A protein has these predicted regions:
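N-terminal cap/lid segment of alpha/beta-hydrolase-fold proteins
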Residues: 1-26, 265-268
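Conserved alpha/beta-hydrolase "acid-adjacent" motif
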Residues: 39-40, 220-230, 257
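Short amphipathic alpha-helix adjacent to the substrate-entry channel of hydrolases
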Residues: 40-58
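Catalytic nucleophile-loop/oxyanion-hole region of alpha/beta-hydrolase
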Residues: 58-91
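Short glycine-enriched nucleophile-adjacent loop
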Residues: 99-110, 115
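Accessory cap/linker subdomain of secreted extracellular hydrolases
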Residues: 117-203
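C-terminal catalytic histidine-bearing segment of alpha/beta-hydrolase fold enzymes
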Residues: 191, 195, 214, 229, ...
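Short beta-strand/loop motif that positions the catalytic acidic residue
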Residues: 207, 213-215
């Protein structure tokens, strides 16, 4: 697959553009995976190319696994580049934290007319970093939000657990439940300690076009089913122009990728075993 790489220093955002072989005037900003050119990102490109869609993969930075004060201007610049390079219809898709980012960006930029949030939240929370620190793999960053705009952090729900208790709670719950990772208690306890305010809620009623929300009851990272139901209620209570579609599965965990995309992942994995 041919791509054009983008760097913060020269382009204002980190990502890669993958043009579809067919002549398409549609593009998706895909924030799937930890890096814009990693395994999951490339898989999402292959899947979207099969649908005849150009793809702009994006991530915070090369091998940057945290999310803190991510400037929405980066997505704004990516939209501008896509428009000047023949894309008339632009959508955005994200999963997990980037699902929340997709909703937030779409509520700011009306050029996004298809928004897909896979296991998103309906609010913005405190920024965090991943790596290694005092024996912890993840920790919250004081005074920082997940996202920022025009140099200011967006209002956010603070975590009630500070470093290192933040990670210890996740670690303890993961061990207790036997899950790969379990952070649901972290989010539930934080919302109990600090009920979500209107300023922290994503204004999904400002989203244009079509909004698709997908989650599962058995999500153990956070209660995305509750968050999606709150968004459904919000849309009923407020005037809006977008069309909302939502699906909540009973069993799908935190990773609710389409079956055909999962098949692409398996195919790619088998191919890599043969090639390498």
């Amino acid at each position: 697959m041919q791509k054009r790489h983008f760097e913060m220093e020269t382009d204002g955002f980190y990502g890669a553009y993958w043009k579809c072989k067919t002549d398409s005037d549609c593009a998706m900003i895909a924030m799937i995976g930890d890096d814009s050119e990693d395994y999951l990102a490339r898989t999402s490109v292959k899947w979207l190319h099969k649908l005849g869609v150009n793809v702009m993969t994006m991530s915070p930075a090369k091998k940057d696994y945290g999310h803190h004060n991510y400037p929405l201007e980066r997505i704004e610049k990516a939209i501008s580049w896509l428009k000047t390079h023949g894309n008339q219809k632009i959508g955005i898709v994200g999963a997990s934290t980037t699902g929340t980012l997709a909703l937030t960006a779409a509520s700011y930029f009306e050029d996004l007319t298809l928004t897909i949030g896979l296991t998103p939240s309906d609010f913005i929370w405190q920024g965090f970093m991943q790596g290694k620190k005092d024996g912890c793999k993840e920790w919250p960053i004081e005074g920082e939000s997940l996202f920022s705009y025009k140099g200011e952090p967006l209002p956010y729900m603070p975590f009630c657990y500070k470093h290192p208790d933040y990670w210890h709670v996740i670690e303890k719950e993961t061990k207790r439940t036997g899950d790969m990772i379990n952070s649901r208690k972290l989010f539930d306890d934080s919302e109990t300690a600090h009920p979500i305010t209107e300023e922290e809620i994503i204004k999904i009623e400002k989203i244009h076009g079509t909004l698709l929300l997908i989650g599962a009851e058995d999500d153990v990272l956070w209660d995305t089913a509750k968050y999606i139901r709150r968004m459904e209620l919000r849309m009923k209570e407020r005037p809006h122009t977008c069309r909302l579609e939502s699906v909540i599965y009973e069993h799908a965990t935190h990773f609710v990728f389409p079956e055909s995309m999962l098949e692409t992942i398996i195919e790619t994995d088998r191919l890599s075993e043969v090639v390498f």
